[in-house]
Structures are given as structure tokens and as C-alpha cells.
């Protein structure tokens, strides 16, 4: 699994490696959540390449399934995505999810890390 553990002052988070596929299917997602549990990390930093392409097509249901699994296990997720992916229906979805505290999309890793470190 191409991930690392980052320990902050109050929280640890799992960081996906930019440029590497990480979650290709539901089994990979469960493995990632299990890895979080093993390392006492309740947060995840992901990049576009870490997510399946279907994640960005809302009609596939993949985004809903992925985010619901993270929510069920109380894992907070920050995703660093290029602006080119955050458009259309997926862009509207991002606007809605960014209002909550479970999943947010950022254009810079620094912003994502700040959000993960908060609270």
C-alpha cells in the first residue's frame, strides 16, 4: 500500500502518495480504513490519482460509496484535486461536501493538511 503515516500534535493521518493508484475498488477502500485503524489515524489525505476514475462520475455511485464508508468508520478525508476535475455535477457535489466536516476538497496539499490538523 503506497501510503505514509504523518503524526501531528493531536492527530495522525494517513497520506496517499501522489501519482499512485490507491483505492481501485471497495476491497482497497476497506484495507485503507483498516490501515488507519491499525495506526490510530482517524484522518486521510488523498490525491486525485489515489481515487478511482469512477469517483469523479457521480452517476457511478462510487463517490457516495467511498465517502459513506469513510463516514461509517469516522475517518475524516481531505482530497487534493486539480480544478479541472472539480466541475459540472461533481463540482456541485464538492461545494456541498465542503460545507460539512467529514470530507473536503482542496487545490493545495498545505491547505488540506491545515484542515486535517484542525480540531
Language-model-derived ranges and their functions:
Residues 2-119:
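Amphipathic, Lys/Arg-enriched alpha-helical "gate/interface" segment within cytosolic domains
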Amino acid at each position: 500500500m503506497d501510503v505514509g503515516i504523518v503524526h501531528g500534535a493531536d492527530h495522525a493521518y494517513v497520506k496517499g502518495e501522489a501519482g499512485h493508484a490507491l483505492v481501485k475498488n471497495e476491497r482497497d477502500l476497506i484495507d485503507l480504513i483498516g490501515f488507519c485503524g491499525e495506526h490510530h489515524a482517524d484522518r486521510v489525505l488523498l490525491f486525485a490519482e489515489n481515487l478511482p476514475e469512477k469517483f469523479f462520475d457521480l452517476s457511478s455511485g462510487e463517490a457516495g460509496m467511498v465517502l459513506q464508508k469513510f463516514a461509517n468508520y469516522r475517518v475524516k478525508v481531505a482530497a487534493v484535486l486539480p480544478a479541472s476535475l472539480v466541475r459540472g455535477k461533481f463540482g456541485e457535489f464538492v461545494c456541498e461536501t465542503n460545507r460539512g466536516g467529514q470530507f473536503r476538497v482542496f487545490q493545495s496539499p498545505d491547505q488540506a493538511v491545515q484542515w486535517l490538523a484542525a480540531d
